[in-house]
C-alpha cells in the first residue's frame, strides 16, 4: 500500500506579531555627569554640551550682556566666515524680533500721494479734456473731503449748549395749562417754596421707586443663585463627600474650583466671632440701647428660670443653658455640681477633670504632704548647761607636760588631714593618772619619752589650729567665749 504523507504547516493564528520597537535616540556622552538629553545628529553630545567636542561645527554664542559684560555660554553654529558673528537659538530669535520692530518704526504708513497714484486709474476722465495734473488735483480734493474729521470743528462753548428742562419733553400739552408759572422769569417767595416742595416730593417718590426696583433685582438674583446652588448640590453633593477618587483630571480641576468658590469670602473661627461682635456693636450704635435686648436671639439665651424669670445669660456653644445652669441639662457630661461640705452644700458647676469628685476652688481638698521634714535632734540639757571646769583653755593645752601614750590612739582626723586631740569629755582624769603611773613603772623610759614628744608636738599643732577659728566668737564685753572642741 502506498502511504500518503501530509505535512501541516504551522499557522500564525493566535500568535502575536512582535511590533518592532523604535530605536530610542542615544543620550549625551557628557563625562562629568550623566546627561539624558538626546544627541545631535551625527554628534556625540547634546546641544548643551556640544562645545566639549572641538571638531563639532559649533562655537560659543557671540552675545555679550550689557548688564554684567558676560558672554552667553550656549552653543551657536559656526559661521562661514572665520570672524563672523553667530548667535544661539534664543538670541537669534530676539535679534530677529528687534530687527522686525525697528523696520516697523522706520517704515511709516502709505503717503497720500502714493494712494492717489494707486487710485488714479479708477477716476472717470473724459478723453482729451483733462490732463494728468488736473486729474491728480481732483483726486486730492476728493481725498481731502473724505478725510474730514471732527477735529476741524471749533470747540463748543457753554453758551452754545442747550438749556432745556430734562422733563420738558416728557410733559404733555395739557401740562402747560396746568402750570402757568412754568415760563415765568420772576417768582415770589411763596411760589419758590411751593415749586421746591413739589420737586422734592417728586424726587422722593422717584428714589422710593428706584429702591424698590433694586430690592426686586436683588431678590431675583438671590433666588436664581439659591436655585443654581441647589442644582449643583444635588448633582455634585455626593462627589464632594466621597472625594476626587474615580474622577478625570478635568473633573478634578472643576471640583477644586467649585470648592474654592464655596469658601470664597466666608469667615471661619476667630474671624467669624469678631465679625459677629462687630455687627452687634454696629447695631447698638445705630439702633440705640432699645435694641440691645434683641441682639441676642432667643435660641441663644439660657432656658433656665429663676423665680419665674428667664435667665438672660448667653448659652454655651452647642447647648441651651448658661454656665450657671448647665447642670440642669441631663444630657451633658462635661460638668458636675460641687458637693461642698456637710455643713454648707455647694451646687456650683465644675468641669469634669481627672478626679472622680470635682470640687470648686473653695472646697478643693489639698493632697497629703509628700515631704516630711527631718526631726532635729534635741541637745540634752546637761550638755548645754555644763560647768565651765570641763573646758580647757589654750594655755592648759600647751606642750609643757608629756601626754600619755593612750591619747595617740584616740586622735581624730579632720577634713584638712590635721590630727586633733580627743575631747576632754570622753575620758576620766583619774583613770589617766593611774595609767600614767603604771606606764612609768614599766621601765621603758626611752620609748615612752619619744612617743610622748611626738604626741605633744601633734597635739599642740592641732590645738592651735582649732583655737584660731574660735577667735571670731566674742561676747558682749569683747572677750572670747570658751567653746568645746568636738
Curated annotation (Swiss-Prot):
Location relative to the cell: Nucleus; Mitochondrion
Deletion phenotype, per the entry, is: Conditional knockout in podocytes results in glomerulosclerosis and kidney failure, leading to early lethality.
Question: Bias regions of kind Low complexity — which residues?
Answer: 442-454
Covalent cross-link Glycyl lysine isopeptide (Lys-Gly) (interchain with G-Cter in SUMO2), where: 78
**One of the GO BP terms on file:** positive regulation of DNA-templated transcription
Q: Does the keyword field hold Flavoprotein?
A: no
Keyword entries, A-Z: Chromatin regulator, Isopeptide bond, Mitochondrion, Nucleus, Phosphoprotein, Ubl conjugation
Q: What is its main location?
A: nucleus
- Compositional bias (Acidic residues) at which positions? 167-178
The entry describes its oligomerization and partners as: Component of the NSL complex at least composed of KAT8/MOF, KANSL1, KANSL2, KANSL3, MCRS1, PHF20, OGT1/OGT, WDR5 and HCFC1.
Listed name of the protein: KAT8 regulatory NSL complex subunit 2
Q: Per UniProt, what is the name of the gene that codes for the protein in this document?
A: Kansl2
Amino acid at each position: 500500500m502506498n502511504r500518503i504523507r501530509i505535512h501541516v504547516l504551522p499557522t500564525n493564528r493566535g500568535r502575536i506579531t512582535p511590533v518592532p520597537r523604535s530605536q530610542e535616540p542615544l543620550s549625551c556622552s557628557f563625562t562629568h555627569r550623566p546627561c539624558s538629553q538626546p544627541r545631535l545628529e551625527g554628534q556625540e553630545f547634546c546641544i548643551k554640551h556640544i562645545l566639549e567636542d572641538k571638531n563639532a561645527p559649533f562655537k560659543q554664542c557671540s552675545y555679550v550682556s550689557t548688564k554684567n559684560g558676560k558672554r552667553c555660554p550656549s552653543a551657536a553654529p559656526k559661521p562661514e566666515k572665520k570672524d563672523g558673528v553667530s548667535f544661539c537659538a534664543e538670541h537669534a530669535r530676539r535679534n530677529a524680533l528687534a530687527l522686525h520692530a525697528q523696520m516697523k518704526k522706520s517704515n511709516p504708513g502709505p503717503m497720500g500721494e502714493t494712494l492717489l497714484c494707486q487710485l488714479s486709474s479708477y477716476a472717470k476722465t473724459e478723453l482729451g479734456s483733462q490732463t494728468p495734473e488736473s486729474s491728480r488735483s481732483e483726486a486730492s480734493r476728493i481725498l481731502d473731503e473724505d478725510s474730514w474729521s471732527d477735529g476741524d470743528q471749533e470747540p463748543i462753548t457753554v453758551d452754545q449748549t442747550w438749556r432745556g428742562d430734562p422733563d420738558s419733553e416728557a410733559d404733555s400739552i395739557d401740562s402747560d395749562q396746568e402750570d402757568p408759572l412754568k415760563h415765568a422769569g420772576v417768582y415770589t417767595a411763596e411760589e419758590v417754596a411751593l415749586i421746591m416742595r413739589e420737586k422734592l416730593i417728586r424726587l422722593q417718590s422717584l428714589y422710593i421707586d428706584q429702591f424698590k426696583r433694586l430690592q426686586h433685582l436683588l431678590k431675583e438674583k438671590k433666588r436664581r443663585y439659591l436655585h443654581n446652588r441647589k442644582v449643583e448640590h444635588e448633582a455634585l453633593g455626593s462627589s464632594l463627600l466621597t472625594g476626587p477618587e474615580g474622577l478625570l483630571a478635568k473633573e478634578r480641576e472643576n471640583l477644586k474650583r467649585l470648592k474654592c468658590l464655596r469658601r470664597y469670602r466666608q469667615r471661619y473661627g476667630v474671624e467669624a466671632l469678631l465679625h459677629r461682635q462687630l455687627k452687634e456693636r454696629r447695631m447698638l450704635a445705630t439702633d440705640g440701647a432699645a435694641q440691645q435686648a434683641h441682639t441676642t436671639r432667643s435660641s441663644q439665651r439660657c432656658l433656665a428660670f429663676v423665680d419665674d424669670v428667664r435667665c438672660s445669660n448667653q448659652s454655651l456653644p452647642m447647648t441651651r443653658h448658661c454656665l450657671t445652669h448647665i447642670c440642669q441639662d441631663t444630657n451633658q457630661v462635661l460638668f458636675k455640681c460641687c458637693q461642698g461640705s456637710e455643713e454648707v452644700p455647694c451646687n456650683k458647676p465644675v468641669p469634669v477633670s481627672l478626679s472622680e469628685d470635682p470640687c470648686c476652688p473653695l472646697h478643693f481638698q489639698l493632697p497629703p504632704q509628700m515631704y516630711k521634714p527631718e526631726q532635729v535632734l534635741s541637745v540634752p540639757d546637761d550638755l548645754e548647761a555644763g560647768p565651765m571646769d570641763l573646758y580647757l583653755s589654750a594655755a592648759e593645752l600647751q606642750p609643757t607636760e608629756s601626754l600619755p601614750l593612750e591619747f595617740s590612739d584616740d586622735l581624730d582626723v579632720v577634713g584638712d588631714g590635721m590630727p586633733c586631740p580627743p575631747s576632754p569629755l570622753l575620758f576620766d582624769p583619774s583613770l589617766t593618772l593611774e595609767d600614767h603611773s603604771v606606764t612609768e613603772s614599766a621601765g621603758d623610759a626611752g620609748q615612752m619619752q619619744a612617743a610622748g614628744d611626738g604626741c605633744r608636738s601633734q597635739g599642740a599643732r592641732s590645738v592651735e589650729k582649732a583655737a584660731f577659728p574660735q577667735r571670731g566668737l566674742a561676747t558682749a564685753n569683747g572677750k572670747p567665749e570658751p567653746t568645746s572642741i568636738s
